[in-house]
Amino acid sequence: MNIHEYQAKEILRSYGVSVPNGRVAFTVDEAVEAAKALGTSVCVVKAQIHAGGRGKAGGVKVAKSLEEVRTYASELLGKVLVTHQTGPEGKEVKRLLIEEGCDIQKEYYIGLVVDRATSRVVLMGSEEGGTEIEEVAAKTPEKIFKEYVDPAVGLQAFQARRLAFNINIPKKLVNQAVKFMMGLYQVFVDKDCSIAEINPLVVTGDGKVMALDAKLNFDSNALYRHPDIMEYRDLDEEDPKEVEASKYDLNYIALDGNIGCMVNGAGLAMATMDIIKYYGGEPANFLDVGGGASEEKVTEAFKIILSDPNVKGIFVNIFGGIMKCDVIASGIVAATKQVGLTLPLVVRLEGTNVELGKKILQESGLNITAAESMADGAQKIVELVR
């Protein structure tokens, strides 16, 4: 789960991690009032969306007067911001962070992620702050330094200090930087983060180490332990289809193609998308209905797939183990009738009660194309949507 920058900074502040003073605003008047309350000569007006690259897209403005705050807030609120992370459709700006300006002397990058290769949290740092870390990794990987954290003891101060020296934090500010990194690590662990990224971390003219921007992502599987984090969820920033799917414990991710997929099991779902691509088609989604799909769940899955106007056909690929093929077949028939499906539908069933499942489909009287194998099904749906 993602949250906004201002929310991430609230969490960091509660752990003693240094961030600029700022206030969130939902209207132009609130933005002006926030700037007044800050009482600084320079304010930064920052668009709040769940995407990076806001500065390059014109989503961050420096205001030197209340009138400029009003002007920039008017420009940004309601604007569709397109960045390299939003896709061409962009995201509408519905809230702003009004923040005090900083006298930036130097920018750095600090981040925490889980390294799957070592099964450890890794603390990363670079003095190439303010740019995409992926770009730095591709062009100048030697400028990224890493410290691997032993989960038994956690991040040690000597590791944070070594990283601070490696990325050339001024010596007089190393202790500040160490405190910053230790606090960031504590947030990462306590809140079950998947990413904690500060880009840039800045050194200011008055000798402070501060998070100028902050990104926290959380492990969705651990959110049941964090009702406080769940309160930060902004459904406006999420795909409505994905939100609806989560209500029924369906794993749905929207893609750009025109062939809707309904599959049980993440591995089979990925293989299904691959084979559709192999035969020249484009999957419209990843949809895993799980191992215990009911008739209601299958119906909702169909509704979610069909809510995508780009979908021109549906491929249902089910291997019945825990889930029985006759239950899935009954669900498919009921869902097809309920939603009034007119698009091509190809169904491949295999596993428990497969013959009974196929019989239910054949006797339904509906226009359902049966497939004998995954490859056969993929070829048929690709041909039908052409």
Swiss-Prot record:
Binding sites annotated in the UniProt record for substrate: 264, 321-323
Keyword annotations: ATP-binding, Ligase, Magnesium, Metal-binding, Nucleotide-binding, Tricarboxylic acid cycle
Protein name: Succinate--CoA ligase [ADP-forming] subunit beta
Binding residue positions for Mg(2+): 199, 213
Domain of life: Bacteria
PANTHER family reported for this sequence: SUCCINATE--COA LIGASE [GDP-FORMING] SUBUNIT BETA, MITOCHONDRIAL, SUCCINYL-COA SYNTHETASE BETA CHAIN
Cellular-component GO terms for this entry: cytosol; succinate-CoA ligase complex
Pathway entry: Carbohydrate metabolism; tricarboxylic acid cycle; succinate from succinyl-CoA (ligase route): step 1/1
Reaction it catalyzes: succinate + ATP + CoA = succinyl-CoA + ADP + phosphate; GTP + succinate + CoA = succinyl-CoA + GDP + phosphate
Gene3D superfamilies found in the cross-reference section: ATP-grasp fold, A domain, ATP-grasp fold, B domain, Succinyl-CoA synthetase domains
Family: Belongs to the succinate/malate CoA ligase beta subunit family.
Role of this protein: Succinyl-CoA synthetase functions in the citric acid cycle (TCA), coupling the hydrolysis of succinyl-CoA to the synthesis of either ATP or GTP and thus represents the only step of substrate-level phosphorylation in the TCA. The beta subunit provides nucleotide specificity of the enzyme and binds the substrate succinate, while the binding sites for coenzyme A and phosphate are found in the alpha subunit.
Cofactor dependence: Mg(2+)
Subunit architecture: Heterotetramer of two alpha and two beta subunits.
GO molecular function terms attached to this record: ATP binding; magnesium ion binding; succinate-CoA ligase (ADP-forming) activity; succinate-CoA ligase (GDP-forming) activity
Domain ATP-grasp: 9-244
Residue sites binding ATP per the record: 46, 53-55, 99, 102, 107
GO biological process: succinyl-CoA metabolic process; tricarboxylic acid cycle
UniProt gene name: sucC
Protein EC: 6.2.1.5
Binding note for cofactor: Binds 1 Mg(2+) ion per subunit.
UniProt cross-references to InterPro entries, sorted A to Z: ATP-grasp, ATP-grasp_succ-CoA_synth-type, ATP_grasp_subdomain_1, Succ-CoA_synthase_bsu_CS, SUCC_ACL_C, Succ_CoA_ligase-like_bsu, Succinyl-CoA_synth-like
